[in-house]
Amino acid sequence: VLTSCKLVSGTPRSPSACLRVWFSGSDMNEKIPANGVGLVTPQIAECDTPFTFANGALLGSHELIYETYGELNSAGDNAVLICHALSGSHHAAGFHANDDRRPGWWDLAIGPGKPIDTERLFVVCSNNLGCCDGSSGPNAINPDTGKPWGGQFPQPQVQDWVRSQRWLAEHLGISRWAAVMGGSLGGMQALQWAIDFPDWVEHCVALAAAPGLTAQNIAFNEIARHAILSDPDWHEGDYLAAGALPTRGVALARMVGHLTYMSADGMSDRFGRELLEGSFAPDDNAERVFQVESYLRHQGSRFSTQ
């Protein structure tokens, strides 16, 4: 029985709050920390049972790539599912190699003695079905054509991710989740778990998430979508077969996305009208580059090349 469901909005400022590190991670790895999960190896679960999507599309078989941290107890009920956001992946903690520049995206929160304590909990994070980090998705090979699925891959919904995660839980011998948690789109998955399978979830933690999008959310997403669709390298979603990548459209979409991640006040506090290049002098003909412009360009470029 679901015993708690917690919605958390905003970004806590307390140094002790684990939520502050939701999308953080060190850029340098001089030494793998002793209090982390260390080196981790992604695993792949193969499902040969046909999977029917909420929209009626059928996938004969599929794969889910995932990582685990900690050990599952004999009852199979000390497991925690971490659901990633739109730009996340299964790599939530630890390092894949000694020379990795940064750990998994929630490394500061997952590990021995950390808020998500791997000395007590068995932590699971999978790459969502339909994503491009190792689970079956548009860049996987369609067995019927021998080519990447591209735009022909079924369009998943949150319910589909939750159902595929339930299959993974059963595959791993998990009897129920001690908690399902995630932020943003990951938080929506946590909520969907509580709705669809309440007997499977003891605690639901949804961070910066809601049961549905507002009109403004939908509008910003539409602009971001059209930025990608308008890129000549999009090729109706079959860009891999065309030997192209819609990096310009993705970069612009990411810039739009970052406008929604901060409030107007937060953006003013962080950037103001500070210049990175140029000046306000009337006789200065050099291009002015505001710090906020540089920030958006950097985020767009970085995301589009991942």
Regions found by a protein language model. Give the residues of each.
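Catalytic-loop region of hydrolases
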Residues: 28-82, 96
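N-terminal cap/lid subdomain of alpha/beta-hydrolase-fold enzymes
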Residues: 67, 72-142
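Conserved hydrolase catalytic core segment
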Residues: 178-215
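Conserved acidic catalytic loop of the alpha/beta-hydrolase fold
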Residues: 148, 159-178
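Alpha/beta-hydrolase-fold enzymes
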Residues: 206-303
